[in-house]
Amino acid sequence: MDKKVLIKRFSEAIEKGNAAIFAGAGLSMSQGYVSWPELLNDPATEIGLDSKKETDLVTLAQYYKNENGGSRGILNQILMDNFGEELEISENHRILASLPIETYWTTNYDHLIEKSIREAYKNPQVKKNYTQLATTNPNVDTIVYKMHGDIDDVSSTVITRDDYEKYDDDSYALFKETLKGDLLTKTFLFLGFSFTDPNLERILSDIRWVLRENQRPHYCIMRKILKENFVDSEDFFDQERYNYELTKRRLQINDLSRFSINVVEVDDYSEITDILKSIRKKYLRKTIFISGSAVDYTPFTSESKGLKFVEKLAYRLSESGYRIVSGYGLGIGNSIVSGVLKQRRNLRKNNIQDVLSLRPLPLDMPHEWRRYRENIIAESGISIFVFGNKLESGEIVTADGMIEEFELSVQNENIVVPIGFTKGASKVLFDKIQENFSDYFDDSLKSKFQALEKLDTEGEVDKKVEQIVSLINSIQED
């Protein structure tokens, strides 16, 4: 599957509020936690086996438990030794936590997912056993389902065949039914997952049996089988084993398609980070930050005509499916709200929370303004600048706050679109982009951008609004 398709489809799922993540061991290994073969290396050696040669590691853990008189005490200690330490979260965790993803499933015992969510100033609810499934915290932002338990309750973790068989009990079956429900109603992205978990395989089979070809599409990112991984210390390349693993991967990808899981293969794990960044960028570009302030509405001949332009712009952006965030700038804030409200009213929808976010600056706390601006802009992927003037000592001057918002937008990797014909700071910023256009836009968009420099007559306001929307839509296709 082409990664551009994955980026497009999963960002759309986030926008619709039905995206979910399924995290396997690979998501944590980059930070220093061990893989299953590494975890069971010493136990396997003790009972005369080699964890690197075993594919059924659940049974290997069961064998070790059996050889220790049916006690899993030593296994519990091995888990504590390997997962008890709190490690730093990865960039991938941070990217995911920054997105409005409300559901995580994981087989990992560590705390990296919930830790990253808290660092993003969100409140996760962790459900690590079946007794917690029926309760939901009303103030929760994200639910993290830990279907194999948590290192803080090591004796309840799932690692042996005995533990997996508990999922056939009525109590543990609730976890399976909850996951089935999410797989039916949400779009999952599987990360760091090998698809060797017997519970998940049975759940996917149950869904496939019921829905047949009507299953919901899901996505997975896997690293390619690379030749360099089959070269030993003496530079001997094991062609036979390499070909075997290639064939096995091809068959696995084909098998996953039965469950409507589409696989994207990458050459290097760093590409996963790039894909997640692209997903975030694609999602954020559906949210537009409108920066502006005005006491003078030149080139318009009256304040009402200038405000009408802002209202029409907000209306058309909302109508085109964009969410708007604004600091409720001086002289334009009401018009932004009015434009969005009118568009929603035409759709017979009164709720505007999902399409408009207002974050006025605390006027009595100027020392906090930069942080407020950073937080507002971080919600968006495109910044539009209109007008940009204010009164200072009785004179109309350029709004320096808009210049700062431009700089913060660039820092946030936003696409920046100053509407040059509205003068003030917007014209200053428009000229700045003109000087080094390729630093901000693809050259193919130059004519569309330059069309925003002048307003010949007030009668062409509707035309200018359409030109702005057309430029924004073209950016989405980039």
From Swiss-Prot:
One of its GO terms (biological process) is defense response to virus. GO terms for molecular function: hydrolase activity; nucleotide binding. 3'cADPR binds at G292, S293, L330, R373, K390, G401, E405. Residues 1-287 form the Deacetylase sirtuin-type domain. It catalyses: NAD(+) + H2O = ADP-D-ribose + nicotinamide + H(+). It comes from the Bacteria. Activated by 3'cADPR. Residues 288-478 are annotated as: SLOG (STALD) domain. The keyword Nucleotide-binding applies. Keywords: Antiviral defense, Hydrolase, NAD, Nucleotide-binding. NAD(+) binds at A19, D110, H148. Its EC number is 3.2.2.5. CDD domains: SIR2-like. Changing L361A: Slower NADase activation by 3'cADPR. The active site is at H148. Homotetramer in solution. Has an N-terminal sirtuin-like domain (SIR2, residues 1-287) and a C-terminal SLOG (STALD)-like domain (residues 288-478). The SIR2 domain probably has NAD(+) hydrolase activity. The SLOG domain binds 3'cADPR; binding alters the protein conformation, allowing NAD(+) to access the active site. NAD(+) hydrolyzing component (NADase) of the Thoeris antiviral defense system, composed of ThsA and ThsB (maybe AS248_15445). Activated by 3' cyclic ADP-D-ribose (3'cADPR) but not its isomers 2'cADPR, cADPR and very weakly by ADPR; binds 3'cADPR better than 2'cADPR. Upon activation binds and hydrolyzes NAD(+), leading to cell death and inhibition of phage replication. Belongs to the soluble Thoeris ThsA family. This is NAD(+) hydrolase ThsA. It comes from Enterococcus faecium (Streptococcus faecium). The gene is thsA.
